[in-house]
């Protein structure tokens, strides 16, 4: 069960939609919503005023929705710790972290302090729900698609998403591969989910002319999916953290929220 959801708050235009999505998710699961605002006062012109603006926005929307909440405000200006590490520390006391799809324009204007979703996913120890930077998503988790490929990544993501799967009206386990589900794997997967009170379908999509990422995005549109679940492996590539070609592509082209798990 989801009991406490953490939403990262900042000054970016996408914060409003991210907060609305978090409130809807908290109401759906009867969870507490923790708002986390991380900032660096030496880099800001009016840190106290900006912090007050973010807090007022958060409390007004949450109180209006009738959701229980907590507020956390952290100044890392004089700490020897990065933003992702600080967010990860506080996320370890919650069930899920909600952030927005990162946009270069937000970073350039210093709206948002998040520069690496990979670092958040790797360091939080919790599933990370990424909300598209544009659009509204009031009903997250009614129709869920899990990108499945037998192995630790997909298994961890499925388990992390279990409270969402149990509350969903429709769950589809999708594999875009030639061999998956060929030896009764689909039946075992369905049976396992059934034992957890999840009624799911399994679907094997043979690889075609489209990439795996585009195939998954097409399925999202065709099946009216409102949440995609994806397991990713974070590795170091040329000195930078990298979540792989498929994860990177989906993060850039996402049309619905994605729950990512490492």
Residue ranges with predicted function:
Residues 112-116, 187, 217, 242-247:
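Charged helix-capping and loop-helix junction motifs
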Residues 37, 101-102, 231-233, 262:
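Short secondary-structure boundary segments
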Residues 110-135, 152-163:
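Active-site glycine-rich loop that binds ribose-phosphate moieties when present
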